[in-house]
C-alpha cells in the first residue's frame, strides 16, 4: 500500500493548560462554604496540579482535531487492518484503538497485522488513536521523570550495556556488515543505494567535514562497533581512538581494526566512559560524536558538552550528530517517543528540537560552522534495517523469541515513517571552539554539505569476515 501522509492531532496549548492549573484550585476554593486565603489556595494547587494536568492532557489527546483534512482517511474498520484474535482489544471494534494498547498487545502476540507491518502502519491514522492512556501516564510519572531527574553515570553504564551488549548477532541481523547504528546518507536519489553505500557515504562525509588529515588525533565518542574508527584510520591515516561502554562492541571493533591492518598505535577501541579517556585536555584535534548524546540526558547535557569542549584542541573541529524532535509536535510524536524510551532506548531522554541543541552547544562555548538535517536520510537507512530484520525472522525468533522480534519489527517500521514525516529527525552539526584565535578562514575549504565532492579515493573496510561466516 502507498503511504498515507495524513496529519494527526496537534499538541495542546500551554496557555490553556496553565489556565486549567491555576483556575482549578481557585474555583474549588470559591465553592467552599467558608473563607480561605492564599495559603489554602497553594495547598490546593499542589494537591490538584498533577490530577488536573493529567485530566486535561488525556481529554485533549482524545478529542483534539487533526491539524488539517487535506488527506482523507479511507474510513475502513479496525479489523480491515489488524487481526484482533481473542484479545481484549475486541472492545475497540468499530472505533479506533489507542496505539499504546495496540502495540503492547502486538508484542504479546495477542493481535496481528493483516499484511506487511510497514504497509499497515502507513494507514495507522485510519485505525488507531494517539490518546494518552493510564499506562502512558504511569510510565511518565514512575519511570521517565525519575530517570530524567536522576540520570547518573552508573545509570548510563547499566542501560547502555543492557541494550548494546544484548548480542552482536541481534544487531547484525538488521545493521548488516557495516554494523553502524546511526543514520546513513543518501547521495543518489535516482537509485536505491545499499545500506553499505549509505553508511560509507555518511562516514566519508563526517571525515571530510572534520578535514581529517594523516596524523590527526581523532576521538569518536560512542563509537559502537568501531566502523567509523576503522574507516577514518584506513582511509585518512588519522590516529583514532573510539570509546564505548559496551564490552561486546569494544571487542568487535578491536577485531575490525586488526582485520583492516590498523595497528594499535594508530587505532584503538576503549571500553570506558569518555570522561575517563587517558589523555590531557585539548589532546584531540578532531572529535566525532554520532547519536550518542541522546543517552546523556537532559539534566547533564550542558555538562557533557563542556567536558567534550575540554577534550578538543583550541584549533580542533567536532562533528556532532544527534537525533531530535520537532518543536510543534503532534500527539502521535509523544506516544511514539514514549514507546521508544520504554522499549528501545531507555534513558535516551535528550532527543530535543534543533534550536535547543544549538543553544546547548553555544552555551558550552562552541561556534556552529554548519548544520545538515538528515531526517529523510534516517528514514531511508531505517527502511533498509527493516528489510534486513524481516529477512532474518527465523534466526531472531530462534535465539531471542517472538516478542523481541515483534518489538524491533514495530520499532523499525514505525521509525521509517516517523523520520520521513518529520516527527523525528537527525541533525549533523559541525562546530569548533568560539575563540578569537581560531583560524576560521582555513576552515572554508572543508565547509562541506551532503553533496560536496570527496577529496580522495575511499576504500571499503573489511567487515569481520569470521563473524559473518558464522552467521551465514
Give the positions of each predicted feature.
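Conserved beta-strand signature within the Rossmann-like core of class I S-adenosyl-L-methionine
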Residues: 315-323
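Feature captures hydrophobic
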Residues: 1-199, 205, 234-236
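Substrate-binding/catalytic lobe of Class I Rossmann-like enzymes that use SAM or dcSAM, i.e.
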Residues: 323-441, 445-447
